[in-house]
Amino acid sequence: MSASPIADYHAFPDAQGHFGRYGGSFVAETLVGPLQELAQAYDQARQDPAFQLAYDRDLAHYVGRPSPIYHAQRLSDHVGGAQILLKREDLNHTGAHKINNTIGQALLAARMGKKRIIAETGAGQHGVASATVAARLGLECVVYMGATDIERQKINVYRMKLLGATVVPVTSGSATLKDALNEAMRDWVTNVQDTFYIIGTVAGPDPYPRMVRDFNAIVGREAREQMLAEYGRLPDAITACVGGGSNAIGLFHAFLNDRQVEIVGAEAAGDGINTGRHAASIAAGRPGVLHGNRTYVLCDDDGQIIETHSVSAGLDYPGVGPEHAFLADTGRARYLGITDEEALQAFHLLAHTEGILPALESSHALAQAIKLARERPRDQIVLCNLSGRGDKDVHTIAAREGLVL
């Protein structure tokens, strides 16, 4: 990965959906028309003040934005070094950042006259957020979820059903997020006339990476304004977990042109990158095409996607959003691996020091924030995106620690 200077990171993607050599649209001919229709509808909606007003109103009165920035004082004192601040996306309605995106896409679906939405989910948070907005707008909702993830996220599966969604188990492949995304795409090809596909991460063919980023960018815009208002300065470093990378790009985007702010993504190193049991696509992957876009993917020498592992269902994905691949190649962001064990230690530490249960996904970011803080003096600030709450993961953590609930 060779770094190259970029004058304005906000100028990307280009008109074809490319972030440098990444992104684009590599899809079957049957999807070209629907994607063009979606891109046109989205670009029109972005310019419509009425659409923006409806979105902003829902963020304020339904989601509960703005989410606060919280100074984790006791955690910072325990760790030593820089002060750790948390962007509290766990306090949103449904308990994670995912609803920022599903609200926007569901409003777009209604604007396009679609009556049915489909979604893929790993940890279940995107599925819950999709089912939530479908219920609010009176739309049919079908969620595809890997059978492996259904087993480790039973609470979220039940939440989706309570909200009126149909949850379809996916047993192909590793029965995790990538397989759920495959099945959702097949559904969309078949039912495109009345169906809107709400992708939950900044992956997929254009316009999805930019659309999902734009709907999540409220996180970084708020955080930047809050930092200046409350601290009179920007953070020295920011970090977020990266699977597909929607919460991360949501935080990162507002800071991309602030060159003094270090940006670090926390990938899922699983049992350790050297073991092969991980989901660190940038740290250990290579450029390839997955789910309609060119990005870093985990594959073998023949280009076949390999199975991934993470204690976190939401990070268990063999690719990454193309904008993250671009940021890595240009040197604007670093992407480092956090192991399962490091994430679990961070989970327990935040619970004990601050009374907050972070999602396992967010625990990876927290572990990275702790590492960054230890390297820095006390007068510096590390801002961590706490992308979701950990209620959904209690059974997984208990089982891993030999407890039966």
Swiss-Prot record:
Query: What broad class of enzyme is this?
Result: lyase
Q: Which reaction does it catalyse?
A: (1S,2R)-1-C-(indol-3-yl)glycerol 3-phosphate + L-serine = D-glyceraldehyde 3-phosphate + L-tryptophan + H2O
As cofactor, the record names: pyridoxal 5'-phosphate
Q: SUPFAM superfamilies under this entry?
A: Tryptophan synthase beta subunit-like PLP-dependent enzymes (SSF53686)
The protein's GO terms of the molecular function aspect are: tryptophan synthase activity
- The EC designation for this entry is 4.2.1.20
Keyword set includes Lyase: yes
Write one Pfam family the protein is assigned to: PALP
Q: What keywords would UniProt list here?
A: Amino-acid biosynthesis, Aromatic amino acid biosynthesis, Lyase, Pyridoxal phosphate, Tryptophan biosynthesis
The pathway this protein participates in, as annotated, is: Amino-acid biosynthesis; L-tryptophan biosynthesis; L-tryptophan from chorismate: step 5/5
Which residues are annotated as modified residue N6-(pyridoxal phosphate)lysine in the UniProt record? 98
Q: Which GO terms describe its cellular component?
A: cytoplasm
Record-linked InterPro entries: Trp_synth_b_CS (IPR006653), Trp_synth_beta (IPR006654), Trp_synth_beta/beta-like (IPR023026), TrpB-like_PALP (IPR001926), TrpB-like_PALP_sf (IPR036052)
Annotated PANTHER family: TRYPTOPHAN SYNTHASE, TRYPTOPHAN SYNTHASE-RELATED
Outline what the protein does. The beta subunit is responsible for the synthesis of L-tryptophan from indole and L-serine.
Which protein family is named in the record?
Answer: Belongs to the TrpB family.
The record's subunit annotation is: Tetramer of two alpha and two beta chains.
Instruction: State the name under which the record lists this protein.
Output: Tryptophan synthase beta chain
What species is given as this protein's source?
A: Stenotrophomonas maltophilia (strain K279a)
